[in-house]
């Protein structure tokens, strides 16, 4: 994948070349998207809109840390949707990991989460965030146990994953209507890189075959159900809904 690769560390240790080789990235000086190695982290920038700043994954500090400490925890909609209740903490495959926010929420309440991400740049950002998170004295120990990254396409990987998870979580990219600064900034940078998930409808069936309990699909409240498969079971919030479908074990047991 072509992208502008920038090293701002000043270290001159060839780390950027190693990163490019690992993730199959090719330097393109003219590309409007830049993957930048700073002294603190790896970040994604939209070069023609520098005011948007850099997008990076940070599990230990910032917004995700605030959400972990002061958010709803088990009361968060995503936790309710996957079925967290009492001592039940399902094993989850997040098949559209993105920047890992929902996966981190689930891991922070005790679920084991395997994140799938097919875009090599996004996978590199996630991997960088995980490496720093794993090394964090406050969250590192449990993060290593509960949150892992698999760089693969969900369309193929969903048939190969073992052991099977109890829940498969899907949050395919869908054009956002919200005007909030954060969504606006992140989505403009993010969608410039990955675009909409045009093949997202193809994820529902393999997800239902893989999950032993349920599949949860996060959708904006104005979006149609994934693959136009309606369900009456959903957890709703102000701007989203989490559509819930049965997994294979439930279907075969009927």
From Swiss-Prot:
SUPFAM superfamilies: S-adenosyl-L-methionine-dependent methyltransferases. One of its GO terms (molecular function) is rRNA (guanine-N2-)-methyltransferase activity. S-adenosyl-L-methionine binds at residues 101-102, 117-118, 153-154, 171. Gene3D superfamilies: Vaccinia Virus protein VP39 (3.40.50.150), YhiQ-like domain (3.40.1630.10). It catalyses: guanosine(1516) in 16S rRNA + S-adenosyl-L-methionine = N(2)-methylguanosine(1516) in 16S rRNA + S-adenosyl-L-homocysteine + H(+). It comes from Enterobacter sp. (strain 638). It is found in: Cytoplasm. Its EC number is 2.1.1.242. CDD domains: AdoMet_MTases (cd02440). GO terms for cellular component: cytoplasm. This is Ribosomal RNA small subunit methyltransferase J. Specifically methylates the guanosine in position 1516 of 16S rRNA. Keywords: Cytoplasm, Methyltransferase, rRNA processing, S-adenosyl-L-methionine, Transferase. The gene is rsmJ. It comes from the Bacteria.
